[in-house]
Curated annotation (Swiss-Prot):
Pathway: Carbohydrate metabolism; galactose metabolism. Changing C55S: Decreases enzyme activity 600-fold. This is Galactose-1-phosphate uridylyltransferase. It comes from Escherichia coli (strain K12). InterPro entries: GalP_UDPtransf1, GalP_UDPtransf1_His-AS, GalP_Utransf_C, GalP_Utransf_N, HIT-like_sf. The gene is galT.
Length: 348
């Protein structure tokens, strides 16, 4: 009888953060593709675009003028998804038609005044300032809201509506679905194992190495064993850290370096500005000790085979179970094979 080989045979991998299984089909990786293709952005963007709503000194669609900022710039989203003064929804006991009020705020963070430079093209010093801004915003909003979601949608393929490099910060009066699930499952693991799930996971990955993409003094980026997206990564501190606000100065500056190395490898993989959605998850601000939590960032990039061919989460993925072709180990190997110095900086 043929012996099972995870490189050749379909199998399922369990994601302990979500409680869901992922179908891995490595034998499909060589199938021909005649479907839709993305059009990668080839144009060279200017350092300042007079028509951009996010550039320094420009007027936004609301008529508000941006200051002549020189570092990061944060403002309340002109089209915020959440409002702080939402009235209470009427109480409902209908099990099929439940509703509750959602309060919060939505902010935009411009990473720098340079319209042309995404995260991997910024200096480590500039990236350190971005991390510091994430910390400050999280600390401020965490005084009012239990959940603060820092995230970035990079590229038109991920629905980004403005090419000026920026991220967003949403704060919620509730624990969103993904956060609630991670909170519950990490708490269950902690009760059973007497240690934080992702602290244990970092040690396993450090010992294994096959899924490692970037390692610095304080940080580790891996294609997680249970990755759903082709080149998905999980960025974690090596030490136990509950929230981004708890980082030491050394961890913060080293995180900037890790972010530059990781995002540079992404861009270098297909020699393009690699699209992704990324965001931070940390312990909620709920007044509890939350020792089961470990700070981490998820990177979800859609590209699969090239700068023009992406992964679609449709059909079986929507109706049954998430499926991927490349194994996590194969994806990590491909990311390790490219330089962590951005191709535009290296002159390639």
């Amino acid at each position: 009888m043929t012996q099972f080989n995870p490189v050749d045979h379909p199998h399922r991998r369990y994601n302990p953060l979500t409680g869901q299984w992922i179908l891995v089909s490595p034998h499909r990786a060589k199938r021909p593709w005649q479907g839709a293709q993305e059009t990668p952005a080839k144009q060279v963007l200017p350092a300042h675009d007079p028509d951009c709503f996010l550039c320094a000194g420009n007027v936004r669609v609301t008529g508000d003028k941006n200051p002549d900022y020189t570092g990061t710039y944060v403002f309340t989203n002109d089209f915020a998804a959440l409002m702080s003064d939402t009235p209470d929804a009427p109480e409902s006991h209908d099990p099929l038609m439940r509703c509750q009020s959602a309060r919060g705020t939505s902010r935009v963070i411009c990473f720098s005044p340079d319209h042309s430079k995404t995260l991997p093209e910024l200096s480590v010093a500039a990236l350190t300032e971005i991390v510091k801004t994430w910390q400050e915003q999280t600390a401020e909003l965490g005084k009012t809201y239990p959940w603060v979601q820092v995230f970035e949608n990079k590229g038109a393929a991920m629905g980004c509506s403005n090419p000026h490099p920026h991220g967003q910060i949403w704060a919620n009066s509730f624990l969103p679905n993904e956060a609630e699930r991670e909170d519950r499952l990490q708490k269950e693991y902690f009760a059973e194992q007497k240690s934080p799930m992702l602290v244990d996971y970092v040690q396993r990955e450090l010992a294994d190495g096959s899924r490692t993409v970037v390692e610095t003094e304080h940080w580790l980026a891996v294609v997680p064993y249970w990755a759903a997206w082709p080149f998905e990564t999980l960025l974690l501190p090596k030490a136990h850290v509950l929230r981004i606000t708890d980082l030491t100065d050394a961890q913060r500056s080293d995180l900037a370096l890790a972010l530059k190395k990781l995002t540079s490898r992404y861009d270098n993989l297909f020699q393009c500005s690699f699209p992704y959605s990324m965001g931070w998850h940390g312990a909620p601000f709920n007044g509890e000790e939350n020792q089961h939590w470990q700070l981490h960032a998820h990177f979800y990039p859609p590209l699969l085979r090239s700068a023009t061919v992406r992964k679609f989460m449709v059909g079986y993925e929507m109706l049954a179970e998430t499926q991927r072709d490349l194994t996590a180990e194969q994806a990590a190997e491909r990311l390790r094979a490219v330089s962590d110095i951005h191709f535009r900086e290296s002159g390639v």
